[in-house]
Amino acid sequence: MDKVAARKALIEQRLNLPDRLQRAALLQSVMRIWLFGKPDTVIGAYWPIKGEFDPLPALYRWQEDATLQTFSSKNTSNMPVAGEDIAQIATESIANRSPCKIGLPVIDKVHKTLIFHAWYPGCPMEEDAYGIPKPKNTEVVVPTILFVPCVGFGPGGYRLGYGGGFYDRTLATLQPQPTTVGLGYSNGWLPDFTPESHDIALHAILSDTGVAWQAPEQD
């Protein structure tokens, strides 16, 4: 399989999907359902480029839900939460009130790995060396779930990325190891994809048609 040609073709196809918005809405739902009930409080993601699925709206809803649940649990007066209180929470910084954090990658130029910095809507951003927006001077977080973009994906939970190796090098150094979840549209399925020795299988892959891959649970 020519990965360079496959990568180029899939990116071009993704950019020109006539129903990309509908696919994105479906994948948002799949992602939120997959996250339901997970106890994790720090999730790493990415800033979408080249027509990638945008995971940030679903993650912000996840963070917002956790904030409201925390507020409700602290309301020990047994009185209903007033509408104006909910409105106040909505207008305050969810990121500051929430027990949950969202991290976006920042490239470590020395080690060629990724460090995750806290992100929230409206946080200060700057472009990295590749022109991709990244959080500016926010706290470093260590994700226990890591959503990664897939150009393509194949059997066994392996992904086709951009060929830079940043995620594979990062996963080799993160401790504890996070649960890794690929995100991509179903047109990226590559049935004949063959992983290389340095490729690391993901724990799950989600697409607009549902859970495309889920690693068996270990005893």
Predicted segments with their positions:
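Receiver (REC) domain switch-region micro-motif
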Residues: 43, 146-147
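N-terminal active-site beta-alpha-beta segment that forms phosphate/nucleotide-binding
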Residues: 1-141
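Short glycine-rich anion-binding loops that position phosphate/pyrophosphate groups of nucleotides
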Residues: 48-51, 151-155
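Short, structured patches in soluble enzyme cores that scaffold and shape functional sites
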Residues: 47, 106, 118, 134, ...
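Surface-exposed, charge/polar-rich loops and edge strands
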Residues: 1-5, 12, 137, 141-146, ...
